[in-house]
């Protein structure tokens, strides 16, 4: 029996050639399938900016508060104006101020860079400016214009920034809008430069301005403001709930989109001095340390090796990278056996981070691992939280792998 082929509907393409129209269901699947790739494109371009800003900021804090022994409650500018520093120490303090200012600027560009490259991934280079503008407005929103009937005067007020939520929404919408306009707006060849350098940028910029002012900033700001209000009102219980949530979101995908979103939330709260970044910083290092530790203790606890041969050297590498603030060293373990690795390091990260916060460890500086440890309040408790989380992770993953091995559900290519 012959198999009949359903012919595709044909419509004129943008260049006049025939183009096949895809099945609507396929297009829908394609959208949701490609969206994570666009988001990861933005994240991958944003990470170097975060690293540069974080390391330079770390230098400024180490110089001022560890080397020059400035009290934690005194800012670098106040220390400069105190008149207590001269000569080489004064030069160091000036460099610390420069590093702090420059690092802060780099951090400020992280979200605009993210939004720009998400839009660029969706709509091409024509969407890059719209994404960047939207990302910038998500961190530095336009002032709100309000009329005060008591004084019969117009005045401005500052809205709550939509931050990562706003940047994510506007980058996706702007990217697809520019892509659609580029396909639908057809002009003669001699007007191509006008279209790409003037028409599309102006239309997309106006759209971003209106969308951010009237929709996205109010929506994202309402969410961010609500979260802050609830956590602040809840006091210590709110801080512990926040620590648990941030630790879980930080650990779950080991540097992926959820991790980065949690980072933006934590950094915004830390920058505004609402809540410290303690739980996130601890949760970054617990998974790789814990999984690396599991490769060391498995044979001592069970009498057999429970990991494949290639994971043993990777475990040591993961532990080393953890001290640099890099959690991606744990990814091979999560890929090899997600059912044993992910629950283990999630539990370890949540317990270790929450315990450290509950016992009084405080970190306001938005970096992780050795770059920030000299600036942590109650460092002993902080390190105990890391150790607790790592031990829980290691014991849990060894126990789960042993159970699966005994049930014949885990094949091990041992040394």
From Swiss-Prot:
List residues traversing the bilayer. Answer: 47-67, 102-122, 127-147, 158-178, 198-218, 238-258, 277-297, 319-339, 342-362, 379-399
**UniProt topological domain (Periplasmic) ranges:** 68-101, 148-157, 219-237, 298-318, 363-378
GO molecular function annotations of the record: protein-N(PI)-phosphohistidine-sugar phosphotransferase activity; protein-phosphocysteine-sugar phosphotransferase activity
For the biological process aspect of GO, one term held by this record is: phosphoenolpyruvate-dependent sugar phosphotransferase system
Q: Can you give the residue ranges of the PTS EIIC type-2 domain?
A: 35-410
Domain statement = The EIIC domain forms the PTS system translocation channel and contains the specific substrate-binding site.
- Function field: The phosphoenolpyruvate-dependent sugar phosphotransferase system (PTS), a major carbohydrate active -transport system, catalyzes the phosphorylation of incoming sugar substrates concomitant with their translocation across the cell membrane.
Report what the protein is called: Fructose-like permease IIC component 1
């Amino acid at each position: 029996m012959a198999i009949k082929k359903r012919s595709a509907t044909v419509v004129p393409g943008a260049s006049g050639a025939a183009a096949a129209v895809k099945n609507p269901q396929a297009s829908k699947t394609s959208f949701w399938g490609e969206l994570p790739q666009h988001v990861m494109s933005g994240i991958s371009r944003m990470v170097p900016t975060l690293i540069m800003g974080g390391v330079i900021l770390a230098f400024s804090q180490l110089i001022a508060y560890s080397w020059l022994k400035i009290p934690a409650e005194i800012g670098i500018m106040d220390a400069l104006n105190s008149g207590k520093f001269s000569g080489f120490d004064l030069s160091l303090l000036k460099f610390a101020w420069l590093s702090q200012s420059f690092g802060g600027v780099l951090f400020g560009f992280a979200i605009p860079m993210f939004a720009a490259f998400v839009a660029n991934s969706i709509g091409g280079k024509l969407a890059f400016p719209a994404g960047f503008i939207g990302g910038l407005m998500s961190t530095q929103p336009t002032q709100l214009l309000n009329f005060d009937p008591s004084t019969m005067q117009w005045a401005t007020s500052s809205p709550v920034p939509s931050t990562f939520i706003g940047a994510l929404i506007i980058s996706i919408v702007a990217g697809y809008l520019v892509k659609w306009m580029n396909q639908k707006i057809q002009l003669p060849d001699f007007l191509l430069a006008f279209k790409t350098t003037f028409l599309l940028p102006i239309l997309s910029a106006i759209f971003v301005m209106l969308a951010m002012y009237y929709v996205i900033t109010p929506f994202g700001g309402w969410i961010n403001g609500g979260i802050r209000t609830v956590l602040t009102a809840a006091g210590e219980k709110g801080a512990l709930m926040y620590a648990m949530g941030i630790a879980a979101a930080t650990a779950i995908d080991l540097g992926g989109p959820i991790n980065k979103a949690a980072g933006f939330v934590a950094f915004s709260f830390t920058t505004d001095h609402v809540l410290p970044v303690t739980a996130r910083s601890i949760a970054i290092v617990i998974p790789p340390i814990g999984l690396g530790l599991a490769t060391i203790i498995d044979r001592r606890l069970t009498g057999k090796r429970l990991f494949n041969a290639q994971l043993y050297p990777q475990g040591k590498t993961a532990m080393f990278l953890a001290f640099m603030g890099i959690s991606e060293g744990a990814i091979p373990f999560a890929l090899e056996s997600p059912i044993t690795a992910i629950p283990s390091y999630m539990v370890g990260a949540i317990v270790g981070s929450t315990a450290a916060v509950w016992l009084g460890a405080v970190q306001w500086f938005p970096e992780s691992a050795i770059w920030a440890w000299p600036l942590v309040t109650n460092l002993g408790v902080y390190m105990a939280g890391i150790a607790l989380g790592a031990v829980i992770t290691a014991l849990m993953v060894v126990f789960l792998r042993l159970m699966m091995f005994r049930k014949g559900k885990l094949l091990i290519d041992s040394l």
